[in-house]
């Protein structure tokens, strides 16, 4: 269903009926390149995250939450539309990595903006009287495709850029972002938090949806000097001090949002979500230690292994989500749009995700497969591929050489044992479903390169990024 049809269908009577009752608010806080183990509530012991941990303690923590892609723009598109990247055409970070003319396959170009024909959750919720804002990183197109062109009433700080402006010290003003004034030395996470809090305070008497995608903790690393120094003094080579300071700044931002909800007296009718767009960067930073450690998950950003797509996810809604809930059901970034619509009493239209309301209220989700399609080489060394997870089983098909890797995630969450030879029955079943899904969404595949260099060096992979030989 196209955008205009969707809005016409849901307009009119639904708006007036919904406006007569107290509605729930929605806040979605998105971290950038945040690792699956970067929070205390997920086992991190090197730095603290008391505010995000508070959401988990007072709400729910998910153990099998996934981004729809191992890089940023496609996952962002999936969040705001509820549709898989292969369906929206945004399959790589925008504008994407060019195809290597000597590589074994030619990779397709990603869409360089989210099509205006797509329906965003801002547009869907607008039909029920919601006011909406996007505060922070957008990275779904340039002018003409900004948040305010996609149904959001307010855009602060979002444009075509995928990383923080670099006119000065990383994450510090001055810099140029839409509707965001930054003086010399202003710290970007704090500026964005101030804007987000301002939107909450201005709309505390009206239903609202706040999409709050931080630029943090994306490269280049940057934080306050005193916070970096504090971590350098205690890191002792075990972790990246600047990254740790960035995580704590992110947590402080979440704390600012929670305090704003408490002051406004609307915490009990606000669903708040914290999530990341892809896995953490698992290579060395300036301190010669890994920027983050996704262990026990394999690899990181840019890879279809668990370290590239498994994410931290915590949600809170007082009176609805039981405090301390742990949810093991596999969920995906396509699920947030229908979840918001479900709680708001709005039909979501055509989406690939499902509402998470059942598991948030003590029930279960119907079994379903989850899909990934990333037909590109990533800047982090990832290969073009597609994947499917159904139950405990996960199959990855690599496009360049056709190899397949099959894992039982219940027994092997680190993806060390490739069971493709031992369980060909499972592999055939998953492959058939993956093929059918790709056909249904019109997924664009890489093509064999007739000009491929047989000596093409490819990426120099090491450690857990190397292919997994089949187990005998």
Describe each region flagged by the PLM.
Residues 47, 146-151, 220-223, 259-320, ...:
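Histidine-centered active-site microenvironments of extracellular/periplasmic hydrolases
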Residues 22-26, 59-63, 128-132, 153, ...:
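Loop/turn elements at helix/coil->beta-strand transitions in domains of secreted/extracellular proteins
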Residues 1-13:
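N-terminal secretory signal peptides and thylakoid transit peptides that target proteins
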Residues 45-77, 82-87, 131-133, 153-159:
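Short, structured active-site-proximal loop/turn typified by the sulfatase FGly-forming signature C/S-X-P-X-R
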Residues 90-131, 138-210, 214-225, 229-244, ...:
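Formylglycine-dependent
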